[in-house]
């Protein structure tokens, strides 16, 4: 009885070990590909398989095959380049690039470039494209035609990146700086333009004041002509009228003054008082 029990326990132990080994093998034969990812299978005997594995749980041959996981979502990267413009000005330009690998070219990317494809490819091709594009514009055009520069760089960079299996979803110029000499020249030009605008304003103001003065003088001259014409038409009657008005005004002022004494036209009253 005891011997039978020992045999049974031995068999159960063997089965348990077998199940553990089988479970371990099954676990190593499964791998997951999450959302936004793709996988490439590396086989120890045949190398990189020319197929792309989508999302989900998948099987492989343990110890023979290995999954290489790629993130295929857009990733931002900034690349800065110092190059020369058409008029030989130093240009410091930075591009912000949203990039991702082309899913159907992942085996080729892994085989020829590796998982660090972005670090190996993007800085190199961005420098190459920017040097070629910036050399077509002078410094002033780089400022005034920034959208044109960005568009040309985007078209050329997308074509170049496609050769390596990279897709560029968005490209934008985030920084654009020039050498100190050009910057100082631009600042001096801006100051000169401001001074010119100020001088132009003062000249226009003086012209307006001159026109106003001429208009006023012409109005005064016209008024004087009209008065002279009126005096000539009225003759002595108008002069006598002005004298009467002036006398009335003087009399009114003197009447309000208490220290003023009126004397009649007959001087005999004053003579009688003196005698």
UniProtKB/Swiss-Prot annotation:
Q: Which InterPro entries does the entry mention?
A: Band_7, Band_7/SPFH_dom_sf, Prohibitin
Q: Which sequence ranges form a coiled-coil region, renumbered to this chain?
A: 180-213
This protein's GO cellular component annotations are:
mitochondrial inner membrane; mitochondrial membrane; mitochondrial prohibitin complex; mitochondrion
- Recorded superkingdom: Eukaryota
Where does it localize?
Answer: Mitochondrion inner membrane
Q: Which UniProt keywords apply?
A: Coiled coil, Membrane, Mitochondrion, Mitochondrion inner membrane
Main location (coarse class): mitochondrion
**One Pfam family it belongs to:** Band_7
Q: Does the keyword Mitochondrion apply?
A: yes
What are the GO BP annotations of this UniProt entry? defecation; embryo development ending in birth or egg hatching; gonad development; mitochondrion organization; oogenesis; positive regulation of multicellular organism growth; protein stabilization; regulation of nematode pharyngeal pumping
Q: State its role.
A: PHB proteins are essential during embryonic development and are required for somatic and germline differentiation in the larval gonad. A deficiency in PHB proteins results in altered mitochondrial biogenesis in body wall muscle cells.
**UniProt similarity note:** Belongs to the prohibitin family.
Q: How does it assemble?
A: High molecular weight complex that consist of phb-1 and phb-2.
Q: Tell me which PANTHER family the record gives.
A: PROHIBITIN, PROHIBITIN 1
Q: What is this protein called?
A: Mitochondrial prohibitin complex protein 1
Source organism (scientific name): Caenorhabditis elegans
**Gene designation:** phb-1
């Amino acid at each position: 009885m005891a011997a039978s029990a020992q045999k049974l326990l031995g068999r159960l132990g063997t089965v348990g070990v077998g199940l553990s080994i089988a479970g371990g093998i099954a676990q190593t034969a499964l791998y997951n590909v999450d959302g936004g990812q793709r996988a490439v299978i590396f086989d120890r005997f045949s190398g990189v398989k020319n197929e792309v594995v989508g999302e989900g749980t998948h099987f492989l041959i343990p110890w023979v095959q290995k999954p290489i996981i790629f993130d295929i979502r857009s990733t931002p990267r900034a690349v800065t380049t110092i190059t020369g413009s058409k008029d030989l000005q130093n240009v410091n330009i930075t591009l912000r690039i949203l990039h991702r690998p082309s899913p159907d070219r992942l085996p080729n990317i892994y085989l020829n470039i590796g998982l660090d494809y972005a670090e190996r490819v993007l800085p190199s091709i961005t420098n190459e494209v920017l040097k070629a594009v910036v050399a077509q514009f002078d410094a002033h055009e780089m400022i005034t035609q920034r959208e044109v520069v960005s568009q040309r760089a985007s078209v050329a960079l997308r074509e170049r990146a496609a050769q390596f299996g990279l897709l560029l979803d968005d490209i934008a110029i985030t920084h654009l700086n020039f050498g100190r000499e050009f910057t100082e020249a631009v600042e001096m030009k801006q100051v000169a333009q401001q001074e010119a605008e100020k001088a132009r304003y003062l000249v226009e103001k003086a012209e307006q004041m001159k026109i106003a003065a001429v208009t006023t003088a012409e109005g005064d001259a016209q008024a004087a002509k009209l008065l002279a014409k009126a005096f000539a038409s009225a003759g002595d009657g108008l002069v006598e009228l002005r004298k009467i008005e002036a006398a009335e005004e003087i009399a009114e002022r003197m009447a309000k003054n208490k220290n003023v004494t009126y004397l009649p036209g007959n001087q005999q009253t004053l003579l009688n008082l003196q005698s």
